[in-house]
Amino acid sequence: MYIRKTLLLACLVLLFGGLPPLTFPATTTTLVAAMSIANQDLERYFRPGNGTHSFSGMEDRIAVDVYNYAFLNWSYVEHGNMLCNMEFAQEQARYGEGKVLNVTGRLIHITATDNFSDDYACTPYIRGTLGAPIPDKGETWIALVRRGRCTFEEKVKHVYQQNAAGVIIYNDKQVMQLEKMQIKGKTRNIAAVITYQNIGQDLSLTLDKGYNVTISIIEGRRGVRTISSLNRTSVLFVSISFIVLMIISLVWLIFYYIQRFRYMQAKDQQSRNLCSVTKKAIMKIPTKTGKFSDEKDLDSDCCAICIEAYKPTDTIRILPCKHEFHKNCIDPWLIEHRTCPMCKLDVLKFYGYVFLGSEESILEYQPDPPQGLALVEARDESADLNRSRDFVVDFPRVFVLDSGCVVGAREMLFPCRIPERSQSSLSLRQARDWVSLMSNKLEEQQGLRSMRNDEMQQVIK
């Protein structure tokens, strides 16, 4: 019992005092940063850029979005040998996951083998601009692919299998900000960038007109951008959910152990009460000292429990069923089993203790006397019965009834305190029914005894 209390207290201490606070800024920011930049090359993304940028410690970073932008510069020769160069002052593309490379090569508008208008590169069977063959392996070329219909990973894989040095994926709709492409194969030696829809359409139209376009993918600015609001909300939601679940589990655990403790306490109390009643019944069982050879039978010359012969100095207890045992042998047996080891006679029932559904609800009544008692003893018992017809019912408290009225207190059946709410399975109405039944039984016994007394008096006269 005390061990159970100690374990419960230890659980409470570990839950409230042993766990680190979930709302500390350092712990929260570190957790979110670790979740957000998983599988990234930290040494590359967080090293000082050009000696002018540096990042604080991990504990100062919240949720971050690592970005690498790229410049797209291209040129082509128009009709009349006029060179046209397109250069932008700001980055117009963004690298996806994987290697960040600077590449210059011939731009090829990817088409499907069976459909020259399909430029999604969602199949490994691809060709060049308007169905032209793919450049040879020794030539450096860059693929132009439209976004959609399949994942970025599939598009990059298909053009990489055709020995492309880079791939430009342009959006299929207008967007304000370029997102980061999720690519599984981060070790491929290919520069994969995503650009805006208008730039991709201009490049595809230029290629479809038959111009040879040379394009360069040049690394631009890079760094991290905090997106703390979304991640803080997520962490707060997860933390609150975890705390609520822990509180619910803790309340249920406390309630469970309280109920279990009350049940065990009531069970121990009932066991002690039953043991006390059993000891009272044992005190009523007669004993004798020794058993001489002239009075012992062949079948009862030894104790059935210890299998040892009776000696003149032994204390022998005689049960109501006339079976005899050593006092030191039968008393522990009766306290535990409350029955005769040989014939299973219920000793408590014989001496007037009846169970009413549980060990706590016990009815004590005056049993019928044995047939072999003398007439004088029967007369005395009848007189005692006339003087007192008391019932002691321990449900939920001990009370005394005399002819249906409460007359006063009697020695309680159990010396220990009875709880306010009984754990018995019987209701008070059922207990009253038992009292009424036993009262009727005793009235019948009293009537029979009165008739016997009258007959005995007539015989004596």
Curated annotation (Swiss-Prot):
Disruption phenotype: Flies are viable and fertile. Keywords: Developmental protein, DNA-binding, Endosome, Membrane, Metal-binding, Signal, Transcription, Transcription regulation, Transferase, Transmembrane, Transmembrane helix, Ubl conjugation pathway, Zinc, Zinc-finger. Its EC number is 2.3.2.27. It is a single-pass type I membrane protein. A zinc finger (RING-type) spans 303-344. GO terms for biological process: mesoderm formation; protein ubiquitination; ubiquitin-dependent protein catabolic process. The keyword Transferase applies. It catalyses: S-ubiquitinyl-[E2 ubiquitin-conjugating enzyme]-L-cysteine + [acceptor protein]-L-lysine = [E2 ubiquitin-conjugating enzyme]-L-cysteine + N(6)-ubiquitinyl-[acceptor protein]-L-lysine. Pathway: Protein modification; protein ubiquitination. Residues 98-207 form the PA domain. SUPFAM superfamilies: PA domain, RING/U-box. Residues 26-234 are extracellular. InterPro entries: PA_dom_sf, PA_domain, Znf_RING, Znf_RING/FYVE/PHD. It comes from the Eukaryota. Embryonic visceral mesoderm and primordia of somatic musculature. GO terms for cellular component: cytoplasm; endosome; endosome membrane; nucleus. GO terms for molecular function: DNA binding; ubiquitin protein ligase activity; zinc ion binding. Its main location: membrane. Disulfide bonds: none annotated. PANTHER family: E3 UBIQUITIN-PROTEIN LIGASE ATL42, RING-TYPE DOMAIN-CONTAINING PROTEIN. This is E3 ubiquitin-protein ligase goliath. The keyword Membrane applies. The chain crosses the membrane at residues 235-255. It is found in: Endosome membrane. Residues 1-25 form the signal peptide. The gene is gol. It comes from Drosophila melanogaster (Fruit fly). It holds the Pfam family PA.
